[in-house]
Structures are given as C-alpha cells and as structure tokens.
C-alpha cells in the first residue's frame, strides 16, 4: 500500500526532470568534440533484419518498460556514409530523419522528424551522428537509478523524462534549491544537462519544464496565473485533433479550459481527467510500476510489389517479436498486422486467440492474416506488427482444445529462445524467412 506523504503545509510537491536534447547530449557525453557545435542524431529504418545473411542483431532491453520499446541493434560500426547514404544508379542519396537536434542546430531551423537532407541544407555545418540506442538506454537506466537514490518516489515517464514526488520530504521553500542541486549533480555525474519543473500538481510540473528549458529550473507557485494565457497546444496530451475540437468552443488557452468545467465534465472520464490535469486539481500521484501492455515493431522501406517478399519480411519481423515475448515471459492473445502502401493507403488486420503463445502459432496466424488482407494494386512501403492483451498461461483462461499442443509448442519455442540468447537472434530461422 502506498502512503501519501504531504509536507507541513498540507500540499504535494512534484518535480519533472527532462533531459535536454537527450540523444544529442548522450553523444556529447562520450565525445567532447561534439560540444558547443550544431549537431543532430539521425536514424533510419533498420533494414538489416531482412538481410538473408546473418547480421548478428542483438536486443537492447536493459531499460524496458511500458514507456520504451526494445531496440534491436547491430554491433557493426556506423559512419555517416555507411548509414545515411545510399547509392542508386550511380547517384548518392541521403536517407534518414532527425531524431534529436542540439539547441545550436535548432537555431538554424532544424527540427525533430525532419529529413536529414533538408536539415543539412538549413545547417550545412551541422555534424550528423548515427543513432546509438544501446548508449541511450544504458544512460537512461543509470540516471533512473541515480534519481531513486536522491528522491523518495520516482516515476520514469519516458526514456528521457522522470517525475519525482518530494511531498513531506522537502518543504516548499526548500524545493527550488534542491532541484538546482539535483540538476548540478546529474551534470557532474553523467555530463548530461537536465531541465526541471516544480509544482504542487504533477502535470503542471511537466508543463513547467518547458518554461525551464534549456538547462533551467522553473517553479510554478500560482497555477491559475501560470496557465491563464498558456496556449492549449503547450499542454501534454492535447494534440491537433483535440485542439480543433476545443477551438470550436472558442477555447484557445489553458485559462479558457478552467472556465469551461461543465463542458469538460460533459465529455465524461477523458474530459474530467484532462480538466483536472490542466487546472492542477487532479490529485494524481506518482506511478512507480510500469507494465508493458504491448510489443511491436515496424519497418519502412523502398517500394516492394512482390507479395512473397512482403510475406518473408513479415515472418522475419515476427521472429523479432517472438524473441521479445519469450524474453519478458508474457502470453499475448491479440495479434496486429498493418501493411502500408504507396500514396498513404493502409490495410490492417487484428486477430484475438485465447491460446498459449508459440513461434509456430504466431507465424501461422500472421500468414492467415496476411492472406485475408485485401491486397491493393500498389507497392508496399511499410510493415507494422504488434501483440497485446497479455494473459496467464492457464487452462482456465485459454482454449482447452488446443492447450496441450500449444503448451508443447511453447516449450519448443523456449528451447529455441535459449539458443538465440546464447548465439544470436538469427541463429535459427524458419523456412518462410529465407
């Protein structure tokens, strides 16, 4: 049972810690030459998994949780030329997108998700660094452990964001100095800059971090005054669709939200929750448990018209999901497949089966789903697979008719998993992957 701590004045106190330009800062922490110059970290779809030769792809799962997906990576050294540049019919083409840009690069107009070729036109002197997800996961894991040693209650919200509850541990007049001290310690220990927001409400603390960036600390003492003229798009969770919906009611600021309580209550639970978060009246606490609810993988590639090659790629991606499912020992009962075609056309299929998970079952269900999809006279450019709805491997919850056979296949899958964990993810492949 969680015990709610409050300070002597009876109010709660939250910190929101956000690592500044995390991937770029992580690269700078291991390479001094990248400091104080415009840089960006770039990435592109990892198509090595479709290589018919062994690629020695490994799984990075040290920092797994509901907030972050597992990363499949290769030990192969990446350079700008080898990673971002493709040669097509004698012409070189720069591929990939910006994952994170340093503040120096942002001043040139470089933004997240921008094509790297476009970013280099805006900032020709910018250094582009290939992504190194194992580094980011390990750093995030270490920083999380560091937070736990300095704050009584910590929630990891994403790979580069943390909430801390210091209620009853620090008084209001002490918390700003504590945040500054914590910020300095993280920089000294990890060479990583962070920004920190402080508030009596959890989600206002997160909003305050945006006011603190870069490398600052911002404390919200009067929530009503702080949100009064804040645009609704600034609040986490209010996307473009909801902004449009609010605009229809002439709501453009968070102060306007506060004045429309009845409207939000009419939208039931989602509206009531959002109203509480925006106004700081939600009384939401820290969540220290983070359970994964789904596992997925997607890949984007050049146009493919060959249906057999698309199916082969689905089976290869399935092996990667199987590896993760077996590694964290869950039993998914819902399977999802989406095929993205040219010109923005997408076709998807979902299947739910109350059976014990195994490699044989999952691949056979995917083959069935792919065959049932209405295939268009267009080339495929993206595949997405995921599994969800985890259940216990128990006869009471799963199909009795198939339980014994499925259990046998599950044990076989575990034996294959042991080999893959020892010798690599691609040590054993099925015929439909070749």
Residue ranges and their predicted role:
Residues 1-159, 163, 281:
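Residues that scaffold, gate, or flank divalent-cation-dependent active/transport sites
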Residues 4-9, 16, 242-380:
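DNA-contacting surface of Y-family translesion DNA polymerases
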Residues 157-161, 199-202, 330-334, 378-382:
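Short Gly/Ser/Thr- and Asp/Glu-enriched loop/turn motifs at secondary-structure junctions
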Residues 161-166, 386:
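A generic structural motif
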Residues 164-183, 250:
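Catalytic palm subdomain of template-directed nucleic-acid polymerases
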Residues 174-231, 394:
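Long, highly charged, low-complexity intrinsically disordered interaction regions
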Residues 351-434:
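Acidic, metal-coordinating catalytic segment for phosphate/diphosphate chemistry
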């Amino acid at each position: 049972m969680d015990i709610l701590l409050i300070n002597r004045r009876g109010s709660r106190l939250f910190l929101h810690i956000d690592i500044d330009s995390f991937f770029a800062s992580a690269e700078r922490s291991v390479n001094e030459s990248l400091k104080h110059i415009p840089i960006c970290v770039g990435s592109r779809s990892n198509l090595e998994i479709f290589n018919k030769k062994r690629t020695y792809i490994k799984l990075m799962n040290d920092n797994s949780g509901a907030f972050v997906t597992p990363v499949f990576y290769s030990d192969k050294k990446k350079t700008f030329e080898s990673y971002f540049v493709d040669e097509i019919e004698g012409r070189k083409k720069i591929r990939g997108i910006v994952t994170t840009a340093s503040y120096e690069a942002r001043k040139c107009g470089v933004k997240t998700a921008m094509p790297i070729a476009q970013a280099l036109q805006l900032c020709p002197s910018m250094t582009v660094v290939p992504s190194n997800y194992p580094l980011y996961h390990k750093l995030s894991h270490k920083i999380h452990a560091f937070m736990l040693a300095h704050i009584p209650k910590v929630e990891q919200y994403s790979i580069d964001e943390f909430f801390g509850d210091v209620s009853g541990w620090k008084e209001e007049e002490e918390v700003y100095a504590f945040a500054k001290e914590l910020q300095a310690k993280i920089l000294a220990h990890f060479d990583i800059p962070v920004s920190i927001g402080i508030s009596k409400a959890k989600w206002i603390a997160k909003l305050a971090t945006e006011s603190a960036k870069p490398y600052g600390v911002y404390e919200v003492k009067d929530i009503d005054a702080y949100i009064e003229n804040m645009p609704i798009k600034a609040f986490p969770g209010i996307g473009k669709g909801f902004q449009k919906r609010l605009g229809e009611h002439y709501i453009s600021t968070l102060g306007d939200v506060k004045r429309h309580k009845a409207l939000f209550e009419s939208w039931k639970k989602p509206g009531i929750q959002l109203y509480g978060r925006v106004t700081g009246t939600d009384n939401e606490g820290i969540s220290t448990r983070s359970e994964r609810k789904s596992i997925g993988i997607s890949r984007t590639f050049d146009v493919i018209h060959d249906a057999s090659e698309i199916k082969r790629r689905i089976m290869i991606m399935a092996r990667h999901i199987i590896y993760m499912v077996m590694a964290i020992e869950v039993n998914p009962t819902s399977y999802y497949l989406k095929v993205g075609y040219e010109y923005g056309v997408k076709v998807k299929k979902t299947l739910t089966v109350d059976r014990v998970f195994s490699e044989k079952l999952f691949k056979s269900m995917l083959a069935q789903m792919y065959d049932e999809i209405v295939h268009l006279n267009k080339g495929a450019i993206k595949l997405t697979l995921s599994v969800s709805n985890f259940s216990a491997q128990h006869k009471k919850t799963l199909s009795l008719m198939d339980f014994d056979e499925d259990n046998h296949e599950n044990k076989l899958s575990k034996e294959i998993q042991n080999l893959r964990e020892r010798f690599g993810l691609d040590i054993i492949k099925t015929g439909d992957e070749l």
